[in-house]
């Protein structure tokens, strides 16, 4: 059973006639147009994430050729790289080359790649050194994830899904409500259970 709570940022553009809407990202903690950011950025909106069923950062990597995520054999960790630059996934003493920022908080462990994107508002991948804004652990780039904020009205969302190949049942619940003029709370939970694709390696008692 895999449970997660989550994450991300992005306003997507749409081509209409020959014009494109301005793409706004919050990768550096403020609203900025992609045209004004002096770095290479790939941004994924909430609509894009839902349309292509991006469940986690590994799925995001399949839609961005510069992003590479390599799991350890044990599955407990991962090495995240951008443009071919990445640190070892198993060496704790080595700082990662790519920072992962979720809602403005730095996550030092690449295990966060397991977190779900089911309540993500935007995911942005900034390529190239970003130490000026994000510190030393961003020599290759940064992945920022922004989750949805609480709204001005009560919101309740319930979803259920089933995937036949691995017999996976997914249940999602989201509740959001304001508690004052300036404060609100949002809770997002997801449970996934698969009957196939998981190997149980049970050792006999010694």
Language model feature labels by segment:
Residues 26, 58, 62-103:
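Extracytoplasmic beta-strand/coil segments of soluble accessory domains associated
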Residues 1-19:
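Cleavable N-terminal targeting peptides that direct proteins into the secretory/outer-membrane pathway or into
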Residues 41, 49, 60-61, 123-128, ...:
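Non-catalytic regulatory/gating segments with a bias toward low-complexity or hydrophobic composition
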Residues 97, 109, 118-121, 131-206:
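Outer-membrane beta-barrel translocator/receptor signature
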Residues 17-50:
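Short, acidic, small-residue-rich periplasmic hinge/interaction motif at the N-terminus
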Residues 27, 102-104, 147, 177:
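Residue-level signature of outer-membrane beta-barrel architecture
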Residues 90-91, 97-98, 103-129:
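Short acidic/polar hinge/loop motifs at secondary-structure boundaries
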Residues 19-21, 37-40, 63-65, 76-78, ...:
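Envelope-exposed proteins and targeting segments
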């Amino acid at each position: 059973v895999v449970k997660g709570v989550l994450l991300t940022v992005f306003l997507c553009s749409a081509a209409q006639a020959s014009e494109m809407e301005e793409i706004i990202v919050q990768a550096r903690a403020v609203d900025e147009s992609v045209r004004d950011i002096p770095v290479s950025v790939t941004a994924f909106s909430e609509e894009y994430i839902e349309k292509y069923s991006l469940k986690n950062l590994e799925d995001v990597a399949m839609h961005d050729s510069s992003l590479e995520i390599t799991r350890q054999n044990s599955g407990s960790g991962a090495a995240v790289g951008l443009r071919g630059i990445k640190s070892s996934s198993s060496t704790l003493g080595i700082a990662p080359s790519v920072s992962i920022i979720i809602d403005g908080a730095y996550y030092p462990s690449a295990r966060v790649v397991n977190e779900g994107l089911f309540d993500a508002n935007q995911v942005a991948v900034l390529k190239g050194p970003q130490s000026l804004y994000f510190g030393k652990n961003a020599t290759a780039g940064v992945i920022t994830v922004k989750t949805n904020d609480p709204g001005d009205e009560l919101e309740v969302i319930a979803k259920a899904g089933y995937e036949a190949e691995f017999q996976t049942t997914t249940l999602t619940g989201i509740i959001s409500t304001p508690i004052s003029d300036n404060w609100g709370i949002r809770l997002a939970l997801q449970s996934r259970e698969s009957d196939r694709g998981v190997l149980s390696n049970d050792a006999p008692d010694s």
